[in-house]
Design a protein with these regions (language model features):
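A glycosyltransferase accessory/donor-loop signature
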Residues: 1-22, 30-31, 37-40, 50-52, ...
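Short, surface-exposed beta-edge/turn micro-motifs
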Residues: 3, 100-101, 132, 151-152, ...
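Short, flexible loop segments at the rims of nucleotide/cofactor-binding pockets, characterized by
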Residues: 12-13, 88-93, 113-115, 173-175
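Short loop/turn motifs at secondary-structure junctions
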Residues: 31-32, 108
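Short loop/helix-cap segments at secondary-structure boundaries that form the rim of catalytic
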Residues: 45-51, 126-131, 232-234
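Active-site-proximal specificity loops/subdomain of glycosyltransferases
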Residues: 47-107
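GT-A fold catalytic core of metal-dependent nucleotide-sugar glycosyltransferases
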Residues: 58, 62, 92-149, 156-161
Length: 266
């Protein structure tokens, strides 16, 4: 399994700190695999990522038609499909999400596990490298209907240039609109996706909306969807304080074992 890796996308300076925390969390759980940071040209300074021990891979945004760009740029997408459950930070650019597809071009690897740069690994997940393509956890954060949809914050992939080219053929077609960008597209491209337990991609709003499912002693990955833990101010800072404090402890390299035990008993 040496030709395996975790991979994330860092497409703006604001996600550099997220990817650093993600790498720290993988190191803390004694992962055997590297973290590859896909970085589009001129999108951020990769030096802090390299200093954290990440491997850098330059990737490029797919070439989109003008019509596709107009439909999916931030203002247009938010008018047509507003985020009414939480707030996306100002640095979020929906078009950048499609850079995630470039991981299928990393054919020097046999298997990749993608993690969004706003995720944190609490327990070792190296075993996911043995899982087939395409595995993902449900988009579970508000009600049980989320079990019917996947969330693209974590998934397994088998790199293939042929797969990437098929994706490009289906991605930018006349009139197509991917409501949640890469997430909606990937569910369409992999309609028979394999469902992982939600504990492999526990969305932070699950902590607020379905607390009976938030079991600290079993969660493997936290996904800080919507507001980010490194944002200085947002409307849910107090409600999400235990999750935010945990993220900062990992980012700053503090021991979180005791904190996790205390949270599990709470």
């Amino acid at each position: 399994m040496s030709r395996c890796a975790f991979v994330t996308l860092v497409n703006s300076p604001d996600y550099v700190i997220g990817a650093q925390a993600l790498k720290h969390s993988l190191d803390r759980t004694v992962s055997a695999y590297p973290l590859i940071c896909m970085v589009p040209p001129n999108s951020c300074d990769p030096a802090p990522l390299e200093a954290a021990g990440c491997k850098i891979k330059e990737v490029y945004t797919p070439r989109f038609s003008d019509e596709f760009i107009r439909r999916h740029k931030r203002d247009s997408l938010h008018r047509r499909a507003p985020f009414d459950k939480g707030s996306k930070p100002a640095f979020h650019d929906p078009l950048n999400n499609f850079c995630k597809l470039a991981l299928w071009q990393l054919t020097q690897f046999d298997k990749l596990v993608f993690l969004d740069a706003d995720t944190l690994v609490l327990r070792n997940i190296d075993h996911l490298m043995n899982y087939p393509e395409f595995c993902a956890a449900p988009n579970l954060y508000e009600d049980l209907d989320g079990f019917h949809r996947m969330n693209s914050g974590l998934f397994t992939a088998v790199p293939s240039e042929a797969t990437y080219q098929k994706m490009l053929e289906q991605l930018d077609r006349p009139g197509v609109f991917w409501r949640r960008t890469d997430q909606t597209f990937l569910q369409s491209f992999f309609p028979r996706w394999h469902g992982l337990p939600y504990i492999y991609n526990a969305l932070q709003y699950l902590y607020l909306n379905l607390p009976q499912l938030w079991q600290w002693d079993s969660i493997h990955v936290i996904h800080y969807q919507y507001e980010k833990p490194w944002q200085k101010q947002h409307s849910k800072v107090e409600k999400l304080k235990p999750l935010i404090d945990l993220w900062w402890a990992v980012y700053e390299g503090r021991d979180i074992a005791v904190d996790l035990d205390e949270l599990a008993r709470a």
